[in-house]
Amino acid sequence: AVGELKLNPGRADYPDEGYRSRFSHATEKAAPGYYEVMLDDYGIKAQLTATQRVGIHKYTFPKGKDGHLVLDLVHGIYNYDGKVLWANLRVENDTLLTGYRITNGWARTNYTYFAISLSQPIREYGYKDKEKVRYNGFWRRFNMEKNFPEITGRKIVAYFNFDTVKESELVVKVALSAVSTEGAIKNLHAEASRKSFEELAEAARTDWNNELDHFEAEGTADQKAMLYTSLYHTMINPSVYMDVDGSYRGLDHNIHQAKGFTNYTIFSLWDTYRAEHPFLNLVKPERSVDMVESMIKHEQQSVHRMLPVWSLMGNENWCM
């Protein structure tokens, strides 16, 4: 954001009260591995791409304006009171943030660790803890709301200010891990370190082209769009659920090592057994072998000794 700093998301019917922004579909550009849009309220161009474990953001701020970045550890795709069990954020230095967020919900105990690298140094930062009931012991002896390097809680929203007057572009690389912040840092270094946004976006484009080039089809433009969109969807889930060193969080919430296979999660088996998995057996047999091995590990880690019903982020949802 630019201008007045807001730490509430705002309502859909009144976006001016929060940090959300209006946008027009006319400024959107979307392709496998890439998304771009103009945030009209702030005049910020947002571009997104990804590697397997790292999301890369590029924000171009208006010339002559300081930039703000809001890190909301409360809100997600769907929200309700009590969803966030605990969250932590550390400012390791002026270009590296680490932390984690533990949530319940469909995945009853979902651990998400992160490491965030910034292309420009932080000028100043602060937090808001929106929890109504808080521990007010030793930690509250510090002024933790501004330039304090660590914050924990259930309803944490942080802000970071940057001097973007001279350099208007800010690249943010967000690496994820279900294991640890150390694992997230390893993922960041292995997949996105020392590479520009443009290089990473081009690599994502190449990877998706390699995936989608397995088929040649004849037909109308609409028919081809339907085919390749469906093919694209089959390559999203099940998804890889392990760090670059093979570490992953198992169904028993212990840390395991995937030896000789790639560990997967998100098995919506009630509807994928009919079409997607037979399809993957034909076009990606090596991937199917890894998925079967992942299901076997799920069974071995299950206190019920059951294969997955509906596996999500290393949790059994007992759904469908």
Give each language-model segment a name.
Residues 1-264, 297:
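Beta-sandwich/jelly-roll carbohydrate-recognition scaffolds of carbohydrate-active enzymes
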Residues 265-320:
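Aromatic-rich carbohydrate-recognition surfaces in CAZymes
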